[in-house]
């Protein structure tokens, strides 16, 4: 049954210089996009779930490893355990929003979206023959369900480590909050907050709890519905007790001494229109998707009220998550900054096709040399995680690491994700709240 509305292009009246017409889609497209493992399991020659990939056999698995992970295993930095492919379904609310609204979505000439309400903007299978496939795919990622409508991450530990020695150089303990003002599908109000005079799409707020010298340092980011409008970002400096606006160039600086830039948050935390985007094709890759309580867990945090423990670390410098990897259908999205002075040459984002979340990111410098690796481990929300997340239909952020290959340094990120709107209301994401919380 056709779900997409047939749009007739009359060449003399509607030129390509206006908008790219919406493509019709079918229920089969929906199934393939959101339920790829219902009747199919990805395979690869020489691979069996349960295999351990190490320095001795890595060449056998090269085709199903991202380029950085292949390098690390080949160099003896880590070996990885594998497990069978499992289903990570998103909430039916998000799928239904796609059915209701995707047929009206089009691309404007500047690459922005037109008529987007909620759900997955382009549920059709991307094609390398489509010159706009990369632009469509990045919007599916940008408006994906990575944090649901509202997410709190607390506790959230960032540990700076020397890759060579494993020495812990510093540890920051955060609390983070994420809120979608529009395109909402789960929490009321849906699909948007009625009062949003700033036309904000998303708010991000973080506060440092420890160590003492950085306590109460806070960051606030407003991303706007108009993607051509630059984000606003503010930093409350705890020891100075004042708010300062971040300049545009500071989003590519190291954030609080870590291996992440603000632009790196969640894989890519910037405007779609700041990059040129290309679809690099589909491939089956080993990705860190798992059930949290089935992994080897650390003994931290201690005395958590829910009895929660972080994923543990292993490998060279203790820079790798101690988790299992599973073979999943993945889309390669290649982003190249339009600014010739940008420190990054390109981002290679490996998107999990079912959840449209970033499973790994490999960045290259302007010379074309591999620079950083940034995987995000995903835990199942219904199995082996917190009761508050059950039924939320989100592939939960569960562990991440940024390895700066050139600097020989890494930042591991261990966290407790909660999909809830108990705390996350618009008044939390204001400059006034920065001052209030910093007192």
Give the ranges of each region predicted by the language model.
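C-terminal soluble interaction/assembly domains
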Residues: 336-421
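Bacterial N-terminal signal peptides
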Residues: 8-17
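Long, C-terminal catalytic modules of enzymes
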Residues: 418-439
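Acidic, serine/threonine- and glycine-rich low-complexity intrinsically disordered segments
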Residues: 218-293
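Extended beta-strand-rich segments in extracellular/periplasmic secretory proteins, especially
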Residues: 164, 172-197, 204-210, 265-349, ...
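Solvent-exposed N-terminal domain segments of exported/luminal and surface proteins
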Residues: 23-231, 237
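Coil-to-beta-strand transition motifs
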Residues: 199-201, 212-214, 226-229, 240-242, ...
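Bacterial N-terminal signal peptides that target proteins for export
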Residues: 1-8
């Amino acid at each position: 049954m056709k779900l997409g509305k047939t749009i007739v292009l009359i060449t003399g009246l509607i030129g390509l210089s206006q908008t790219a017409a919406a493509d019709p889609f079918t229920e089969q497209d929906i199934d393939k996009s959101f339920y790829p493992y219902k009747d199919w399991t990805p395979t690869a020659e020489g691979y069996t779930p349960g295999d351990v990939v190490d320095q001795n056999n890595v060449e056998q698995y090269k085709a199903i490893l991202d380029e950085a992970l292949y390098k690390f295993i080949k160099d003896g930095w880590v070996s990885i355990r594998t497990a069978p492919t499992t289903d990570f379904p998103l909430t039916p609310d998000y799928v239904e929003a796609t059915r209701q609204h995707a047929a009206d979505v089009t691309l404007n000439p500047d690459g922005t979206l037109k008529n987007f309400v909620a759900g997955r903007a382009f549920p059709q299978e991307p094609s390398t023959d489509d010159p706009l496939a990369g632009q469509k795919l990045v919007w599916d990622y940008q408006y994906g369900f990575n944090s649901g409508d509202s997410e709190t991450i607390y506790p959230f530990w960032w540990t700076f480590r020397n890759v060579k020695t494993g020495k812990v150089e510093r540890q920051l303990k955060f609390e983070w909050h994420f809120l979608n003002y529009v395109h909402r599908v789960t929490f009321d109000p849906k699909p948007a907050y009625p009062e949003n005079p700033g036309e904000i799409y998303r708010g991000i707020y973080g506060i440092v709890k420890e160590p003492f010298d950085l306590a109460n340092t806070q960051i606030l980011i407003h991303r706007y519905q108009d993607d051509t409008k630059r984000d606003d970002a503010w930093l409350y400096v705890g020891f100075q007790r004042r708010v300062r606006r971040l300049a545009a160039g500071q989003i590519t600086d190291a954030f609080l001494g870590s291996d992440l830039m603000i632009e790196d948050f969640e894989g890519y935390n910037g405007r779609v229109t700041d990059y040129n985007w290309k679809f690099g094709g589909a491939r089956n890759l080993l990705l860190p998707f798992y059930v949290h309580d089935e992994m080897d867990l650390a003994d931290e945090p201690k005395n958590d009220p829910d009895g929660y423990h972080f994923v543990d670390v292993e490998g060279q410098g203790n820079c790798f998550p101690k988790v299992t990897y599973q073979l999943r259908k993945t889309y390669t999205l290649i982003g190249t900054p339009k600014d010739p002075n940008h420190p990054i040459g390109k981002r290679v984002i490996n998107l999990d096709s079912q959840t449209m979340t970033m499973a790994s990111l490999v960045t290259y410098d302007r010379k074309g040399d591999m620079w950083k690796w940034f995987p995000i481990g995903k835990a199942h929300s219904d199995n082996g995680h917190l009761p508050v997340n059950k039924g939320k239909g989100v592939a939960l952020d569960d562990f991440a690491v940024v390895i700066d290959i050139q600097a020989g340094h890494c930042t591991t990120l261990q966290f407790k994700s909660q999909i809830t709107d108990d705390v996350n209301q618009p008044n939390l994401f204001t400059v006034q709240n920065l001052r209030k919380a910093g007192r």
